[in-house]
Structure formats: C-alpha cells, structure tokens
Amino acid sequence: MVVKLYGQVTAACPQRVLLCFLEKGIEFEIIHIDLDTFEQKKPEHLLRQPFGQVPAIEDGDFKLFESRAIARYYATKFADQGTNLLGKSLEHRAIVDQWADVETYYFNVLAQPLVINLIIKPRLGEKCDVVLVEDLKVKLGVVLDIYNNRLSSNRFLAGEEFTMADLTHMPAMGYLMSITDINQMVKARGSFNRWWEEISDRPSWKKLMVLAGH
C-alpha cells in the first residue's frame, strides 16, 4: 500500500520522513500542503495534525503525525527492508536513540531558529533577530565541537553504520550548509565535515534533493 504523506517537500520535517522512506524503499505519495499560504492551519489539515504542522501520514486506516515518530515507526515496521536504521543490538539501538535525542534537544533547538531567521524570514521579507542569531551561532559551535569529537573516532554518530541518528540531522543540515557562516563552521571541523560529506552523498539524499527541486 502506498503511504500518503501530507507536507511540503522542501520543509525539513517532511524531508526527515521522506529520507526514511527512500532508505527503506517504501512507496509513497506526497500530498502537497502549502506552508506559504498556511494551508497547514486549515480545518481539513487540523483533522490530520491538530497542531497545524507538517508532516502527517495516512497508511490505509492508520494515521500518524510528528516526523520523528513517523520515521521510527516505518524504520521498525520495515526493519528487514532496506537500510537498518535502528541498530543491530539492544545496546546499539540505545546509542542510536541517544544521538537521535541529541539531535532533538541539543542540535535542532539551535538549527531551527537559525534557519527561520537566516533563510525563511528573508524570503518572506521579514527581518531576522541579529542578536539571537549571533548567540545561536556561538552555541551551535559548542555543539559542533562535541559532534566533531564523537566523529573523530566513529564513522557515523552511533558507530560504523548509518542509522536514524544520522538521518534525523540531514534536513536541517542541508539548510545550514547553505548559510555561509555555518558552512565555514562545519568545514573548520574536519571529522564533522567528513561525516556530512559522506551522508549527503547517499542516494537517498540525492533523490530527495531532486524531489525538492535542487
């Protein structure tokens, strides 16, 4: 059965789910929700996602929202299909979960407001919060140093295999790398930059960029 994904393919959270689908070889259909016209806030979409965000999925009678929950669900449902994203043992899965949580609580809390202020607001003709941006860059640098140290002795965040721990970072990283200052911050950290170059060379990422019009 084809999974229906409601969202905008250029948005980071739908991209997280799409990357999972592409890594697992899951058939999907994208139902476009236009974020620029706030379609996600309309009553019909609020029935799918009561907080007015994207993505949401429909898989037959099964419905789910929140990108990380969706990605984990399909990585589990299709554990034996495509890339193993969850880990090969209980201990490995715990490390995958650990670094996926790091993405949520340490990385994304900085990446998301940076993307909003440096990419989305200028596109909408709005002013960014310069003071906030500079503070976020400093904090991001500290986080990237920790990642760089981790990746100096590990090929990927959870060890020697690409997993959900890596995948969940990719949409925001794609946006951050288009920001000159942050691109330079990444390239100044050799192990972190090596990791990004490797994961952004995966077929799933290249296919996603085509879907997103890049």
From Swiss-Prot:
GO terms for molecular function: cation binding; glutathione transferase activity. Signal peptide: none annotated. Gene3D superfamilies: 1.20.1050.10, Glutaredoxin. The keyword Lipid biosynthesis does not apply. Keywords: Cytoplasm, Detoxification, Stress response, Transferase. Disruption phenotype: Great reduction of anthocyanin pigments in the vegetative parts and brown pigments in the seed coat. Accumulation of unextractable proanthocyanidins. This is Glutathione S-transferase F12. It comes from Arabidopsis thaliana (Mouse-ear cress). The lineage of its organism: Eukaryota, Viridiplantae, Streptophyta, Embryophyta, Tracheophyta.
